[in-house]
């Protein structure tokens, strides 16, 4: 018999299993037979016809039907609804309205909806567009129109703001729980009950998490007043998001996140138990599933919850692990002798799951790639749940008539389950269920301020605004009932064939150009175990390196390399080249005169070797360069992408001729990726390469060079010359035999190299230089603070700010600067600074003492002038600099780039 651990292992191992394999398992174990499928389809057609004849779609459904995310106008309205209500100043409001309404083509939507209110709104939007659009010429009529625009702006501003509030009302039951409970009376009289959800997304500060917890606790108290039935299933309930209760709900913070979440959720669960209401844990992104199951087990194991049947879990059928999660939940409830609730939903943020998998380079998707597959999974999981009712109370959340018909057919005469729908949607369908089937119906209703609407609105539009969605098709009477009620088991094959052309597997993202680099998902235990186990043999290794040249260098003083996180912890040592050895290497260097096909094959093989040696590369990047786990993965992937990209470029340009000998002088901040990119580009073109890595990171460059040689690059075509810039760097840039220099580093050094080439090089010598600069972000009051702060943290402080692309200057609109900075402060306080070897670390050290002292001096000067707004503390050992925020008047206050975790903030009006 399978144990709880066995079921958990199945959840883990099926994270990205092949879609066909999962579907075969679901259909063979839980799928309806052919006769039942025919009955389901016939029943679904009847349901569609009854719903259409009963009444028209709701305003929400009509809006989604006309303005889904597949239209530019739908996107414009969504953006307007999300941003407008939090903008404090009239000028920005006017600019936002003009930006979103002005360019859109409202005319094509006039009269297209079956809702007179939606059509009237469309007329109003077209009139608004005609008023606010700028005239193309400057005649008298255009002057008059400009005057009308100026006079009309206050009216338009007021009207649009009111319209956006009304739009919010269609999606949100009430701005507070008392108002929501009052508005809920209408459907309570029809026999429905509610599950309330407090609007808002993931907390990014501890203060935000505390506010969400208080809001949930207060909501339970309010709901308790109307929870009058002895049967918990008849009472309203509450849905909560774990990401709202802890600011770092992610695998890297598992040791803290799970127990703290369990404590908070446990407290809310006990309050819900006392109120005799249900408490549902909402499902979130696929990468958080493992954490949520850990937390659920911890909370349910509390003996104080024994006898309470109201603990609920949401399971997303579009996830490939859904069926195995149900098995695990059933096993857990059985082991603990509990009854729980499970809300089965199709799933949210499908687009994000697909895109994330492609970007991360993982083997496959965590979700199904077609609507048919998701619908099949939903029906099979529903069948599975209906066989678990001794321990699980199923809650089927759907607006789809076919899914409803399937559940009713599978259930037969049983009524030990309920249906659920979203507020403002599926009303007619669920009203028919209440009337004809006598089953329970619950409404999932968001509660909160309209300014919190964005993420919820996006989900609703993504799920229900697509052309293929049931809600959209139901509102469109030109789509036949038979088409809407199509059997997904029948359409699966056609959908899969269409999907293969639309949705590219992560590995094939850049095909036919090149293979995508392999990724490691550190939220997945299988990938995490591989990362840790492959890196482990190199945790204490001492690397030794010397110049890799045609003429071997066997003597010279060894230079020790230390871990920037631990000043006295040696990583290895390197024998540096001197000026004469550099000149000798130039004498022995030769262009790589192999055919293009051979060069291309060798570079591709090198990419494969990089990936095969990922354990050593990860270890060396962490220990020599101070890279965190996420940064080591990103760097390896970038290096592999460079190799494959330039291999393909060589194939595209077979007639191009090499320049000759190229010096590649690379930096320490991307000691593998930029080193590899420079070298690969030069080699792909057939040049001979003399590579000088940064003084601080010669060991990773030596490993890369050895792998390139192992792949087949001849030694005369690639030589490595670690050494000082003043000697080796000068020799490699100031010799007439050098035909070009690739350099990444400071502007001052680039200028020195330029002078060297001008004085000693050939007239046509090439200099490709990537140098410093100051990157800025401008955030006005339309920017969503949570999203903006998250991006600021990533851009300014990831990699300890040691990126050429790092954010250096943030311009904030003065009206919103204070709350923005308060949120930024809170988000910074949630960061972990320390040993980059550990997954929990967000920010590692800067590269060396020189960098540490320069950055610290800049921060100290700002502090002395009263301009240091915040700075985090750091460990005592190592070259750590606490992320800092400094007030400036503008970009002109900075004389140079401060290459570290320092963000400068200016305000504007």
What are these regions (language model features)?
Residues 197-199, 240-243, 278-284, 314-316, ...:
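Generic beta-strand/beta-sheet core signal
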Residues 447-448, 452-455, 459-587, 594-612, ...:
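Terminal low-complexity tails and localization/encapsulation signals of metabolic enzymes
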Residues 622, 648-789:
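Rossmann-like NAD(P) dinucleotide-binding subdomain of oxidoreductase/dehydrogenase enzymes
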Residues 707-712, 734-735, 740, 748-891, ...:
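ALDH superfamily catalytic-core signature
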């Amino acid at each position: 018999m399978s144990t709880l651990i066995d079921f958990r292992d199945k959840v883990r191992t099926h994270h990205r299993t092949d879609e066909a394999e999962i579907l075969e398992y679901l259909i063979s174990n839980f799928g309806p037979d052919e006769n039942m499928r025919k009955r389901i389809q016939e029943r679904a057609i009847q349901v569609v016809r009854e719903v259409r004849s009963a009444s028209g779609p709701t305003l929400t459904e009509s809006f989604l039907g006309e303005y889904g995310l597949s239209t530019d106008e739908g996107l414009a309205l969504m953006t307007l609804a999300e941003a407008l209500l939090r903008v404090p100043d009239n000028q920005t409001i006017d600019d936002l309205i003009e930006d979103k309404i002005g360019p859109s083509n409202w005319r094509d939507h006039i009269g297209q909806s079956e809702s007179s209110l939606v059509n009237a709104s469309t007329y109003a939007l077209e009139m608004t567009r005609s008023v606010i659009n700028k005239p193309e010429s400057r005649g008298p009529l255009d002057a008059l129109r400009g005057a009308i625009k100026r006079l009309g702006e206050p009216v338009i501003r007021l009207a649009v703001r009111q319209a956006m509030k009304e739009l919010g009302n269609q999606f949100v039951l009430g701005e507070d729980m008392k108002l929501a409970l009052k508005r809920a009376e209408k459907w309570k009289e029809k026999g429905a009950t509610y599950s309330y959800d407090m609007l808002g997304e993931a907390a990014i500060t501890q203060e935000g998490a505390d506010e969400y917890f208080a809001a949930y606790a207060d909501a339970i108290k309010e709901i308790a007043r109307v929870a009058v039935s002895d049967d918990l299933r008849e009472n309203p309930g509450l849905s909560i998001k774990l990401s709202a209760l802890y600011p770092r709900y992610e695998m890297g913070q598992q040791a803290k996140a799970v127990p703290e979440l369990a404590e908070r959720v446990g407290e809310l669960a006990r309050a819900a138990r006392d109120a005799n209401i249900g408490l549902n844990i909402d499902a979130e992104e696929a990468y958080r599933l493992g954490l949520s199951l850990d937390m659920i087990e911890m909370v349910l194991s509390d003996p104080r919850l024994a006898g309470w049947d109201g603990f609920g879990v949401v399971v997303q059928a579009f996830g490939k692990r859904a069926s195995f999660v149900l098995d695990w939940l059933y096993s857990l409830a059985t082991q603990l002798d509990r009854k729980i609730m499970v809300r089965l939903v199709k799933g949210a943020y499908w687009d994000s799951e697909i895109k994330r998998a492609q970007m991360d380079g993982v083997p496959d998707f965590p979700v199904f790639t077609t609507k048919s597959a998701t619908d099949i999974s939903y029906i099979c999981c529903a069948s599975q749940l209906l066989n678990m009712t001794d321990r699980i109370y199923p809650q089927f959340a759907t607006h789809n008539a076919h899914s409803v018909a399937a559940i009713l057919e599978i259930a037969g005469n049983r009524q030990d389950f309920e249906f659920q729908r979203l507020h403002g949607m599926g009303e007619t369908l669920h009203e028919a269920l209440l009337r004809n089937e006598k089953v329970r119906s619950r409404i999932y209703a968001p509660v909160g301020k309209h300014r919190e609407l964005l993420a919820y609105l996006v989900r609703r539009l993504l799920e229900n605004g697509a052309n293929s969605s049931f809600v959209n098709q139901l509102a469109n009477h030109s789509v036949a009932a038979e088409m809407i009620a199509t059997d997904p088991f029948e359409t699966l094959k056609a959908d899969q064939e269409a999907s293969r052309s639309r949705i590219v597997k992560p590995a094939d993202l850049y095909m036919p150009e090149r293979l995508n680099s392999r990724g490691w998902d550190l939220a997945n235990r299988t990938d995490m175990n591989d990362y840790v186990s492959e890196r482990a043999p190199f945790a204490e290794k001492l690397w030794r390196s010397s110049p890799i040249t045609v003429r071997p260098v066997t003597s010279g003083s060894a230079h020790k390399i230390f871990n920037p996180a631990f000043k006295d912890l040696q990583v290895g040592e390197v024998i540096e080249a001197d000026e004469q050895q550099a000149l000798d290497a130039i004498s022995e260097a030769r262009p790589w005169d192999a055919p293009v096909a051979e060069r291309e094959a060798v570079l591709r093989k090198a990419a494969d070797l990089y990936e095969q040696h990922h354990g050593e590369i990860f270890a060396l990047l962490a220990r020599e360069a101070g890279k965190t786990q996420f940064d080591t993965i990103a760097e390896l992937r970038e290096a592999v992408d460079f190799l494959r990209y330039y291999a393909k470029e060589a194939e595209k340009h077979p007639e191009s001729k090499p320049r000759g000998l190229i010096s590649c002088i690379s930096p320490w901040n991307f000691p593998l990726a930029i080193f590899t990119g420079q070298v690969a580009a030069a080699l792909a073109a057939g040049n001979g390469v003399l590579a000088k890595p940064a003084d601080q990171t010669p060991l990773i460059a030596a490993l890369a060079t050895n792998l390139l040689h192992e792949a087949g690059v001849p030694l005369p075509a690639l030589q490595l010359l670690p050494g000082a810039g003043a000697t080796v760097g000068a020799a490699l840039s100031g010799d007439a035999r050098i035909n070009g220099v690739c350099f990444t580093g400071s502007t001052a050094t680039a200028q020195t190299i330029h002078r060297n080439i001008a004085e000693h090089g050939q007239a046509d010598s090439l200099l490709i230089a990537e140098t410093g600069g100051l990157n800025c972000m401008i955030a006005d009051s339309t920017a969503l603070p949570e999203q903006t702060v998250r991006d600021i943290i990533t851009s300014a402080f990831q990699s300890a700010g040691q990126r050429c692309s790092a954010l250096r200057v943030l311009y904030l609109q003065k009206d919103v600067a204070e709350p923005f900075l308060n949120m930024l402060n809170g988000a910074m306080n949630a960061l972990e600074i320390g040993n980059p070897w550990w997954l929990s670390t967000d920010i590692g050290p800067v590269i060396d003492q020189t960098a540490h002292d320069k950055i610290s001096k800049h921060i100290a000067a700002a502090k002395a002038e009263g301009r240091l707004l915040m700075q985090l503390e750091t460990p005592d050992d190592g070259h750590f600099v606490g992320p800092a925020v400094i007030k400036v008047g503008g970009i002109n206050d900075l004389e140079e780039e401060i290459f570290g975790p320092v963000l400068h903030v200016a305000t504007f009006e």
